[in-house]
Amino acid sequence: MCEVEDLHSCQPTALAKQFGQIDIYLFDQLLRGRITPEMTVLDAGCGNGRNLVHLLRQNCTVFAVDASERAVEETYELARRLAPATPADHFRMERLEELSFEDATFDAVICSAVLHFARGPIHFDRMLAELWRVLAPGGLLFTRLASSIGLENRIMPLSDGRYRLPDGTDRYLVDEARLLKTTTRLGGRLADPLKTTNVHGQRCMTTWSVWKDDA
C-alpha cells in the first residue's frame, strides 16, 4: 500500500491488484473496519470473485457460493492464486435459498447485485432468510440490490414485484419501505442509512447493510 507522502507513485494498477474490482460500497465497509482478517466471510452470489480479492490477500476465512458452476470455478481459481491454503470445499455451487451451511457460521455475509434476480417476493424472502440464518449474532449483512427508489415514474410493472427498467432489463425491485420493514422483521439494525445510486436514470442500486444484534 502507498504511504500518504507517496500518493503520486500509487498507480491504479497497483490498487486494482490489491483490491480487484471490488464494489466501492463494500470497500467502504473495509475502510471502516467492519470486515477484518480474523472474520469468517461468505460471498453469496460470488460471480467471478471480484469482491474477494482483498479478503483473500488478507487471509480471511472465505467461503463463496453461486448458482453458476463456472463462477464457482473461477472464484476457486482466484483463491488458489491468492490464498492457496483455502480448502476447495469453501467454494460451492448452491442456490441462495438452499444454503448448506450451519446456522450462525459467518461473521459477515456479502450479497452484491444478486437479490434483484428474485423471481418474486417469496423467492426474495427465502434467499434473505438463508443469508440471515447463516449470519452469526453480531455479524454484518452487506447487500447491494436494484431498487425502485428514484425511478418510480420510469419503471414498468410486470408481475410478482418485477419491473422493466429503463435500461431494458427485468428485475425484482424493492423500495425504502420494504427494506425498512424487512430490517425490522429480521430483528436487525441498519448499519448505515440506505444509500441509493442512480445510474444515469437507467437503474438504481441501493446499499442495504444490516447488523444482526446479539440475541
Say what each PLM segment does.
Residues 1-36, 42, 47-97, 142-215:
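Class I (Rossmann-like) S-adenosyl-L-methionine-dependent methyltransferase catalytic domain
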Residues 115, 127, 147:
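Flexible, active-site-proximal loop/turn residues at the rims of small-molecule/cofactor binding pockets
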Residues 69, 121-125:
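Non-membrane alpha-helical structural segments and their capping/turn regions in soluble enzymes
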Residues 97-109:
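A short acidic, Gly/Pro-enriched loop at the edge of an enzyme's catalytic core
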Residues 108-122:
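A short SAM/SAH-binding and catalytic strip from SAM-dependent methyltransferases
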Residues 125-137:
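A short glycine-rich, Lys/Arg-flanked "PGG" loop and its adjoining helix->strand segment in the class I
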